[in-house]
A protein has these predicted regions:
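Flexible glycine-/small-residue-enriched beta->alpha junction loops
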Residues: 1-37
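N-terminal extracellular/periplasmic Venus flytrap/periplasmic-binding protein-like
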Residues: 47-152, 156
Length: 181
């Protein structure tokens, strides 16, 4: 993903920007699914904020103690920019400043998504909107690489194997829950 160059929703895809299309497809933004999951599991805003705070504190500790050794620096020769650490760790995060943030997905919920979710999850009387910019995943650029090889290829190289894939399976859940599998 390259969120700094292609911001979320900048492609104006109807599945994300047109509630009628999303409702017809039963595919929603992750935040709508997160609020639905919070509603089903009775997760409170304070619990979500506390989890976010604890996560940030663990990340700060790990970064300060150099536990992110697998991060490889990325150099941009045109702008002389070096990315060598996770830039989304927020050491200044507190429960107080998290609690002051407004829910990010209430508006899209009120535009029709909540009603559809309530139709399919009739045990719920409301969708709680607890997710904010502070307790949701950061919007960031990301890259990763996985090097896969055969056993014989690994044995003949200078790289030490870090794992073995023994089985693969595919699982899918209700698309309205988005984040559940």
């Amino acid at each position: 993903e390259m969120m700094s160059r292609v911001p979320m929703l900048s492609d104006q895809a109807a599945i994300w920007t047109d509630v009628k299309t999303a409702i017809k497809s039963r595919i929603f933004m992750m935040g709508s699914g997160a609020d639905l999951i919070a509603s089903i599991n009775k997760i409170t805003r304070l619990e979500a904020d506390t989890q976010a705070f604890n996560s940030q504190q663990k990340a700060v500790y790990a970064q300060r103690n150099e536990h992110f050794k697998s991060i490889v620096p990325v150099f941009n020769s045109h702008k002389n920019i070096v990315c060598k650490e996770d830039e989304c760790i927020r050491a200044e995060t507190t429960i107080q400043n998290l609690s002051a943030l407004k829910p990010s997905f209430r508006e899209i919920g009120e535009s029709g998504v909540d009603n559809l979710q309530l139709k399919y999850f009739s045990e719920l009387s409301e969708i709680v909107h607890i997710h904010t910019a502070g307790n949701s995943p950061a919007m960031s650029d990301a890259a990763s690489m996985t090097l896969l090889s055969s056993s014989s290829s690994s044995a003949s190289s200078d790289y030490k194997s870090r794992g073995i894939i023994k089985e693969v399976s595919v699982v899918n859940a209700d698309p309205m829950l988005v984040l559940s599998g």
